Every structure is written in structure tokens, then in C-alpha cells.
Amino acid sequence: MLKRMYVKVYGIVQGVGFRRYVQIHAARLGIKGYAKNLPDGSVEIVAEGYEEALQKLLEYIKRGPPLSRVEKIEYRFYEYKGEFNNFDTY
């Protein structure tokens, strides 16, 4: 089933390749959406795709790239909206 997932990631997640890491894994999983740095030092991720793929992406997000340190994750699933054509970073 298609779903939308909102994720906010805290820790050492800016300046360490975190958004690009998420973008690469999202593309491999057929997920569309974006990853964006926020002023508070966290990263916001909005992703749409099949629920199973979103769960896999969430596992990658929890691990993060080698230089990152994920300290806390908040996430929720929502109804699919289909508003993205690819996965972007901001």
C-alpha cells in the first residue's frame, strides 16, 4: 500500500552527507520526496512510496552514513498524496 512518511532526525546529521545518503537509498527503493536541513540542526524527511520500502528507508535513516550520529528519530505515516516526482535534497 502506498503511504507518506514524515521523519525528523536529530543528532550529528548536518554536514556529514546525511541528506545525500537518504536520497541514494530512497532512489534505490523507488521512494519520492525530499530531505531538508532545518535551522535547529535536524533533518526533515518527507517520503512517499510503498509501506515496505518506507520501512526499509527508515532502517537506513536510523543507521545514517559513517560520519553521522543519529540520536533521536520522530516519524509518522500518513495517507499517500502523490505530490513528488523524484527525491530531492534542500
Swiss-Prot record:
Active-site residues per Swiss-Prot or TrEMBL entry: R19, N37
Domain annotation Acylphosphatase-like: ranges: 4-90
Classification via Pfam families: Acylphosphatase (PF00708)
Coiled coil: none
Broadest EC class assigned to this enzyme: hydrolase
Keywords, ordered alphabetically: Hydrolase
TM region positions: none
Family assignment from sequence similarity: Belongs to the acylphosphatase family.
Cross-referenced NCBIfam families: PRK14433.1, PRK14440.1
Protein name in UniProt: Acylphosphatase
